[in-house]
């Protein structure tokens, strides 16, 4: 009781780490004993009912987070009813290693405007903390990894608690914080940011094997990002093994070279105190030299094994035997596992010492499975505690059977005091941390480039140039980015007018301009620029689009991000694209050039499968227009679609357009003759729905050619040739195979639940055809993109497309080789089987 009273320092609003340390120095031995003694669960609350000590409360909450994270997983695997088909899992060991550093962050260090990406395998810890903060329900925790329950990995879109950044594909959430910091810098430089916050990633050390982290690290250095923390849970175990020794020095040098501060939190207070005693220096040297595998094995074996190994290795050195003899086996194990990442005081000291905006990486030494019987074992990643082990832990934590979910059960501080403490935690604001942003007005039409012959890529550049000339809200809120292909994707005109962004106010002189060397590029870099130039790293592109595409929610200021890249290199960043869509980030992806129509460039730069990726990606509407007027219509719609955020859908919205999403535009450098035509409301709607009749079929027509994108000229010529034999044949322009297909599936689902009058756009388009009509589909992509059209009404399909890797050649040569030329289309039309 007397030891406990030592923690009674100040009222919650007046307490501080500095006061605590002064007090601890005066009563060091008693404080040390209290810090590492088991609390008596049957004792009366030891703090007065008026205020509570900060450190004691943090340590109590830390223990509760550990228990809850274990119990959440145990309940999901052993107590909740299941079909028994699959193990539920949940990563108890990975969660345990990060309990202290997460508790220090959320219960003390973070402020409401800070944003956090939590390592995927620590999601039970995150959910437990949110539960204690009042942001998560007991029902959600009990449903962990079940339908409608707390998610296996933190999810912005699936979880009900306060997730800032989704994580799951390791490494991407880490990079996301860097690009979110860049977006915050962008908003700040443009005068739109409100209160700045830190972008924080809690990182599993095995995530540092992910290459995308270093791509992001280098890009962050180029842009001089600020207010960025990466907290490494340095438990030195990956999924399969114990990691290599001596990596930390290499990590530290790498981060230092990128302008980061590196803070290593290696020892807890117990170890620091032991080092100050006779024999302590020898102990420190032994720990520093101990291989990770040996240390992990000793952690698992426990105190007796520690004693034997230490005496064998350094027992002959001065003071060591006396130092080790001071501890019984349990205390020795506690000492040897008292790493910095498991010491609340050490973590608080490290966090609170940083008061500037320099990017900082904390390496917090931890033990995978700390505090659990799984600790240190090399097989613990997927390991689960047995029911008997969990029951022993329950008793040790003083938790009454049946009260396992109670927030403050078993803690030595009165519930009312802990509740008051939690309510006054700086991070635990009652204000919504997800912001709303007013929509950006979009003009009723976008100017269509007037060229009689152009490509969709050229048209895109001219449309953006036209927007750039207008000093309206739309132009101001567009931000563009590209991985070193700004010019070759026709963004150059936009950048000439709107400039490059860099937070530095000092501009680099254009020596070409000063030397009177002519160049089309007049790019000026400034804090007011609207183009973010990236290196050739597609992961960075998609994660930046994710961060910018969530600016309205993260920072309360809406941006309309446009990213450009070569279409085939979507594959290089596909996981990051998936990550962006999974979070419901809003952006326009312009992929150009595309297909084998990029003829001389050869197979390495030609794409065929990307339209299938667009069709398969939730939250992403994929278009492939043929003409400039179609592109203008689609781009205008896209700016509104990015901003749509309806929670519920009105009847008839088969595509969920009222909910909004992102857009993928697959464009081409192939120039084709443009069509002069009025764009009435009906045609505009059909372009957006995904298709329209360029040449309508006669009623009962027996032949249709359906084309997509740049295959329009070949399809037109083939259609002209076929109408001599089949005058009623139709020519279907597909602007979005994705939206036609999604609408068709949605209509089928609606009819299955009784909405029998529901029809899809493609069903209405194909309705005039004869039941035995033949469909010939043509696309500069895999034939499966359009071959499904035959399933709509059970009609025969001859699907033309690209199934092999491309190669260099002229357009006519490649179209003939891959059977996309006029003759091949006509031949397909003539086939009857």
Label for each model-derived stretch:
Residues 4-7, 11-15, 19-21:
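Intrinsically disordered, low-complexity segments enriched in serine/proline and basic residues
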Residues 50-58, 80-89, 111-114, 159-167, ...:
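Glycine- and acidic
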Residues 53-65, 69, 73-81, 92-223, ...:
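Cofactor-binding active-site loop characterized by glycine-rich and histidine/acidic residues
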Residues 62-67, 114, 416-573, 577-585, ...:
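Non-catalytic terminal/interface segments that mediate subunit docking, oligomerization
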Residues 146-163, 182, 186-196, 214-404, ...:
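Thiamine diphosphate
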Residues 199, 204-207, 234, 366, ...:
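Active-site metal-binding loops of divalent metal-dependent hydrolases
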Residues 201-202, 208, 576-595:
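A structural-propensity feature for long, helix-poor, extended segments
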């Amino acid at each position: 009781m007397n030891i406990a009273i030592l923690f009674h320092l100040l009222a919650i609003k007046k307490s501080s780490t500095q006061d605590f340390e002064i007090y601890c120095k005066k009563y060091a031995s008693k404080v040390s004993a209290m810090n590492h003694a088991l609390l008596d669960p049957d004792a009366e609350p030891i703090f007065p009912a008026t205020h509570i000590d900060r450190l004691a409360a943090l340590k109590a909450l830390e223990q509760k987070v550990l228990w809850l994270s274990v119990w959440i997983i145990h309940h999901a695997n052993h107590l909740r009813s299941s079909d028994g088909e699959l193990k539920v899992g949940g990563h108890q060991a990975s969660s345990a290693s990060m309990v202290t550093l997460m508790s220090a962050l959320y219960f003390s260090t973070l402020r409401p405007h800070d944003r956090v990406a939590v390592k995927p395998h620590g999601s039970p810890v995150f959910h437990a903390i949110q539960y204690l903060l009042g942001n998560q329900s007991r029902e959600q925790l009990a449903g962990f990894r079940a339908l409608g329950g707390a998610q296996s990995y933190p999810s912005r879109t699936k979880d009900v608690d306060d997730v800032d950044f989704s994580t799951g594909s390791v490494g991407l959430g880490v990079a996301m914080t860097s690009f979110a910091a860049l977006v915050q810098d962008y908003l700040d430089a443009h005068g739109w940011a409100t209160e700045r916050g830190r972008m924080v990633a809690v990182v599993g050390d095995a995530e540092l094997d992910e290459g995308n982290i270093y791509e992001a690290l280098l890009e962050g250095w180029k842009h001089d990002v600020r207010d960025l923390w990466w907290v490494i849970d340095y438990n030195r175990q990956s999924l399969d093994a114990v990691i290599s020794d001596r990596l930390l020095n290499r990590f530290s040098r790498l981060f230092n070279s990128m302008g980061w501060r590196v803070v290593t939190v290696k020892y807890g207070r117990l170890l620091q105190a032991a080092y100050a005693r006779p024999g302590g220096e020898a102990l420190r040297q032994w720990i520093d030299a101990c291989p990770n595998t040996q240390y992990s094995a000793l952690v698992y074996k426990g105190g007796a094994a520690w004693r034997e190994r230490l005496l064998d290795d350094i027992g002959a050195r001065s003071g060591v035997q006396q130092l080790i003899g001071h501890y019984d086996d349990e205390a020795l194990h506690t000492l040897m596992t008292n790493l910095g990442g498991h010491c609340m005081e050490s973590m608080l000291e490290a966090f609170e010492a940083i008061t500037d905006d320099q990017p900082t990486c904390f390496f917090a030494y931890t033990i995978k499975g700390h505090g659990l019987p799984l600790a240190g074992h090399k097989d613990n990643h997927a390991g689960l505690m047995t029911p008997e082990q969990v029951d022993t832990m329950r008793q040790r934590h003083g938790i009454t059977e049946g009260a396992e979910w109670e927030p403050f059960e078993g803690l030595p501080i009165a519930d009312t005091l802990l509740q008051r403490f939690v309510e006054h935690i700086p991070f635990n604001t009652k204000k919504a941390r997800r912001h709303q942003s007013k929509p950006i007005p979009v003009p009723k039409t976008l100017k269509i480039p007037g060229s009689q012959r152009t490509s969709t890529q050229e048209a895109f550049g001219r449309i953006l140039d036209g927007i750039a000339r207008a000093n309206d809200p739309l132009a101001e809120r567009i931000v563009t980015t590209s991985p070193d292909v700004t010019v070759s994707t026709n963004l150059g005109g936009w950048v000439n007018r709107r400039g490059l962004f860099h937070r530095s106010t000092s501009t680099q002189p254009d020596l070409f301009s000063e030397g009177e060397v002519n160049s089309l590029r007049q790019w000026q870099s400034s804090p007011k620029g609207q183009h973010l130039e990236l290196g050739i790293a597609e992961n960075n592109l998609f994660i930046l689009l994710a961060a910018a595409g969530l600016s309205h929610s993260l920072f309360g200021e809406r941006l309309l991000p446009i990213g450009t890249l070569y279409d085939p290199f979507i594959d290089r960043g596909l996981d990051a694209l998936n990550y962006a869509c999974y979070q419901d980030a809003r952006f326009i992806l312009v992929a150009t050039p595309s297909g084998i129509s990029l003829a001389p460039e050869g197979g390495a730069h030609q794409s065929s499968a990307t339209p299938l990726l667009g069709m398969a990606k939730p939250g992403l509407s994929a278009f492939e227009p043929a003409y400039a007027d179609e592109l203008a219509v689609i781009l205008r719609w896209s700016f509104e679609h990015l901003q749509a955020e309806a929670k519920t859908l009105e009847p008839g919205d088969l595509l969920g357009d009222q909910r909004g999403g992102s857009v993928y535009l697959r464009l081409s450098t192939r120039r084709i003759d443009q069509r002069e035509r009025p764009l009435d409301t009906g045609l505009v709607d059909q372009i957006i729905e995904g298709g329209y009749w360029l040449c309508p079929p006669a009623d009962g027509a027996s032949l249709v050619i359906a084309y997509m994108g740049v295959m329009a000229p070949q399809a037109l010529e083939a259609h002209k040739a076929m109408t001599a034999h089949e005058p009623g044949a139709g020519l279907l322009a597909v602007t979005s195979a994705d939206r036609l297909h999604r609408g068709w599936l949605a209509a089928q689902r609606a009819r299955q639940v009784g909405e029998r009058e529901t029809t899809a756009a493609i069903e209405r388009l194909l309705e005039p055809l004869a039941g035995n009509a033949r469909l010939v589909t043509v696309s500069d992509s895999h034939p499966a993109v359009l071959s499904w059209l035959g399933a709509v009404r059970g009609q025969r399909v001859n699907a033309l497309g690209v199934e092999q890797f491309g190669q260099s050649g002229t357009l006519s040569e490649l179209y003939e080789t891959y059977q996309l030329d006029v003759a091949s289309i006509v031949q397909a039309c003539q086939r009857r089987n």
